[in-house]
Amino acid sequence: MFNGIIVIDKAAGMTSGDVVYKLRRLLKQKKIGHAGTLDPEVTGVLPIALGQATKLIELMHERPKAYVGEGMLGLATDSYDLEGKILAERALSQPVSDQAIKAAMEKLIGEIVQQPPIYSAVRVNGKRLYEYAREGIPVERPKRTVQVFLYDLTAPSQFDPEKGRQTFTYEVECSKGTYVRSLVNDLGEELGLPAVMTKLRRTASSGYKLQDAVTLEELADNLDHAEDYIQPIDSFFADYQQVDLDAALWQQVKNGAWIKLPLDADKVALRYNKTVKAIYRAKGQGLYCPDLMLLSNE
């Protein structure tokens, strides 16, 4: 059984569940889970936990994410992307300046309150929003507070005078739970124009980047060397404070005991034989207790 994290560069047209299903067949193991759903038409970084690494999925969700994408001014849909029903169209008589677009983006940086698109996997009363939408049932979408660390243009925008549409490319860095589709819609509201997301690619998630990723096709063609594409569990904890345990402390940790450490970090990675065996969290006065046990990690 494989243990670790494989970062898949997801192709368009697949759900995150499709990727897990294909990996189970390719790698011939069941214990596999993904960290961070990507919509079918969104491409890019999808971290997949294998074996023992499935214990990390909740922690993986907590890490910031990064995207590059494209949006368009002059059109709005109910899904905030091109998959939805058109709600508004307005031909622009002249382009919006890039300065104005960037200024509107800056207003959406920081802690903001977002409403997810109606076509999203957010649950309300045990049912996903897209299920309500497909059945035509009105439902109040829950608001959530998210963090946007970066929202900026990556190139000059392009104006099509014949269609009265303006396209722009952008980059986003954000916390978990942020909908980039909503950010594009919110940008349009700031500018007083309909806006829709036309493309999106995730470039980083859970601490892993595109350069760490492999496509399913590449993996299938090189199955004899599958291990070459798998990141060790320890790679996820590279930015944690590391503590090497002696034999006595290791015995305590194996038994789930609280231990005393001369540290002030909130969480620490405890290593034995150069391998992370547990994550402990601070309880005050130098005491640390178990947060995540990885005793079988080799």
Swiss-Prot record:
> What would be one Pfam family of this protein?
TruB_N
Read off the SUPFAM superfamilies from this record: Pseudouridine synthase (SSF55120)
Q: Which reaction does it catalyse?
A: uridine(55) in tRNA = pseudouridine(55) in tRNA
Question: Record's CDD domains?
Answer: PseudoU_synth_EcTruB (cd02573)
What is the E.C. number?
A: 5.4.99.25
Which InterPro entries did the record assign?
A: PsdUridine_synth_cat_dom_sf, PsdUridine_synth_N, tRNA_psdUridine_synth_TruB, TruB_C
What biological-process terms (Gene Ontology) are attached? mRNA pseudouridine synthesis; tRNA pseudouridine synthesis
Q: Keyword Hydrolase: yes or no?
A: no
A GO molecular function annotation here is:
tRNA pseudouridine(55) synthase activity
Q: Where is the active site?
A: 39 (nucleophile)
Keywords of this entry = Isomerase, tRNA processing
Q: Which Gene3D superfamilies match?
A: Pseudouridine synthase
PANTHER family membership: PSEUDOURIDYLATE SYNTHASE TRUB1, TRNA-PSEUDOURIDINE SYNTHASE
| HAMAP family assigned to the protein according to its UniProt record, in alphabetical order | TruB_bact
* Known function: Responsible for synthesis of pseudouridine from uracil-55 in the psi GC loop of transfer RNAs.
Q: Which family does it belong to?
A: Belongs to the pseudouridine synthase TruB family. Type 1 subfamily.
Q: What is this protein called?
A: tRNA pseudouridine synthase B
Organism per entry: Lactobacillus delbrueckii subsp. bulgaricus (strain ATCC 11842 / DSM 20081 / BCRC 10696 / JCM 1002 / NBRC 13953 / NCIMB 11778 / NCTC 12712 / WDCM 00102 / Lb 14)
User: Which gene is the coding source of this polypeptide chain?
Assistant: truB
